[in-house]
From Swiss-Prot:
Family, as annotated: Belongs to the RIC family. YtfE subfamily.
Keywords attached to this entry: Cytoplasm, Iron, Metal-binding, Stress response
GO MF term list: metal ion binding
Protein's recorded name: Iron-sulfur cluster repair protein YtfE
One cellular component (GO) term of this entry: cytoplasm
GO BP term (any one): response to nitrosative stress
Database matches in InterPro entries: FeS-repair_YftE, Hemerythrin-like, RIC_family
Function noted in UniProt: Di-iron-containing protein involved in the repair of iron-sulfur clusters damaged by oxidative and nitrosative stress conditions.
Entry keyword S-adenosyl-L-methionine: no
Cell location: Cytoplasm
Disulfide cross-links: none
Length: 221
């Protein structure tokens, strides 16, 4: 099966573990989910045949949940429990760990200087963002008013882009979330947590941008 002409966001939602594969190749399937695999791979000079082969192998595994066919209210509930609640747990702990690592290892060349600040910015942005979704956009969609939500959706997508930009800064600050050989247990735990956060947030944004929002705007109830 040829995947090159399909949007990244669609592939991430329909092929198990495709999102992890895209992360490995640094392909943006959340905020950049509307671009085709061909375009995204070409822009980074990646071997498209290799990526398609890996996708074909992943596609043989049954999909646990087809969110493209799920009711919108079920998608919203999943987002609230799986992502909103989880982000509220993740970020405060990561900020504490980053603050400790920066303080204790301040004299080491591999220390992620500024990481706690960037995580705090992301925490502030996401806290405000999720509150707006929970108080304004999600109730509109659940009440069958999604087709009238173009304004709120546009704002949410713009904020998704801003969160994506912060993730790139965080990846740059942490050497693509790769701990140096001398990293202590706390440092490694911090980077494991950041990798989990990035995976969660990218899947979260992808589900909203590429499934929930388009279907709501199209008038689905």
């Amino acid at each position: 099966m040829a995947f090159r002409d399909q949007p990244l966001g669609e592939l991430a939602l329909t092929i198990p573990r495709a999102s992890a594969l895209f992360r490995k190749y640094n392909l943006d399937f959340c905020c950049g989910g509307k671009q085709t695999l061909l375009r995204a791979a070409t822009r980074q000079a990646l071997d498209l045949d290799v990526i398609e082969s890996e996708l074909a192998a992943l596609a043989e595994t049954p999909l646990e949940k087809d969110w493209q066919a799920a009711p919108l209210a079920e998608i919203i509930e999943h987002i609230l429990v799986r992502y909103h609640d989880r982000h509220r747990e993740q970020l405060p702990e990561l900020i504490l760990q980053a603050t400790k690592v920066e303080r204790v290892h301040a004299d080491k060349p591999g220390v992620p200087k500024g990481l706690a600040k960037y995580l705090s910015l992301l925490h502030e942005e996401l806290t405000s963002h999720m509150m707006k979704e929970e108080r304004v956009l999600f109730p509109m969609i659940k009440q069958g008013m999604g087709s009238q939500a173009a304004g709120p959706v546009s704002v949410m997508e713009s904020e998704h882009d801003e969160a994506g930009e912060l993730l790139e800064v965080i990846k740059h600050t942490t050497n693509n979330v790769t701990p140096p050989p001398e990293a202590c247990t706390t440092w490694r735990a911090l980077y494991n947590g950041i990798n989990e956060l990035i995976d969660d947030l990218m899947n979260h944004i992808s589900l909203e941008n590429n499934t929930l929002f388009p279907r709501a705007l199209a008038g689905e109830k």
